[in-house]
């Protein structure tokens, strides 16, 4: 008898390209197992799926190896930030202060 499977989605995006895959995985699969099966690392060879932060419908999954998937869920693979958000805000505030103090 065939093992029951569920259908999930896996999504990843870069600046240049977005990919959404629909994948059948065995029922009871963890997020980590589904990532190993999905093939996203073949689409994006630079992607290290064992260390990427992931989420399901916008909520970060703390332990992808323990989180069991349900049918219809979407795994989102997150990219690292290119810049520190606090530093960006600091620079933006400094630039705004500069504009206010320049004679105009």
UniProtKB/Swiss-Prot annotation:
InterPro entries: Mopterin_synth/thiamin_S_b (IPR016155), RnfH (IPR005346), RnfH_sf (IPR037021). It comes from the Bacteria. Belongs to the UPF0125 (RnfH) family. NCBIfam families: PRK01777.1. HAMAP family: UPF0125_RnfH (MF_00460). This is UPF0125 protein PSPTO_4512.
